[in-house]
């Protein structure tokens, strides 16, 4: 009979193998391949996770929690040494980032639920930063968290596609940290615009309940006046 500690070890091995295999090869990789990579039987995978979807959800939960813990730690610390240490270890996140990229690309309901959880977590740890005095408060914390999550996820995906060696996630992450960290920090710290004129104008329109995108006078909603050429 397997002990509880052995079961926990097997669960972690299976989960980590799944993250690595699916991150490297995509979600078409079956449970037998995951089991082989973990050094266990396919039956044991089913025993612990029930199905491929159950295993994927366990991987999602694990990664979401790892990201939340790491970001929360950063937000609670005002010591630059801690921030620099986290960036120095960025290559260690390669299996996790490969999995996140596959999840973004899959577009499934499970992936959407996973990313919504990541966004919800982002709202929480950003507020930790506000409470710690590291970040400025927002008039709409939920919208800010959603925006930052999307530009970070989409931005990394674009960086990956443009990298000279996109299959080497360790190299991609190393270069991403070197290329993106300072420009991002400069913009987040110093801002981009010289004053709030544009923000004030859009905010005033939002507060009047007027959508930013709406048909001009005389235009319908059928797109008949669109400047985008119709497909033949």
Briefly describe each language-model feature range.
Residues 2-13:
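Short, Lys/Arg-enriched anionic-surface-contact patches
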Residues 13, 17, 21-54, 58, ...:
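Helix-turn-helix
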Residues 13, 95, 99, 117, ...:
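Amphipathic alpha-helical interaction segments
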Residues 58, 65-102, 106, 141, ...:
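Hydrophobic alpha-helical connector segments
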Residues 67-71, 108-134, 143-146:
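Amphipathic alpha-helical packing segments from all-alpha helical-bundle domains
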Residues 87-123, 160-164:
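Amphipathic alpha-helical segments used for helix-helix packing
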Residues 120, 124, 128-131, 157-232:
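C-terminal peripheral helix-coil segments that are non-catalytic and often amphipathic
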Residues 149, 154-158:
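Outer-membrane beta-barrel translocator/channel fold
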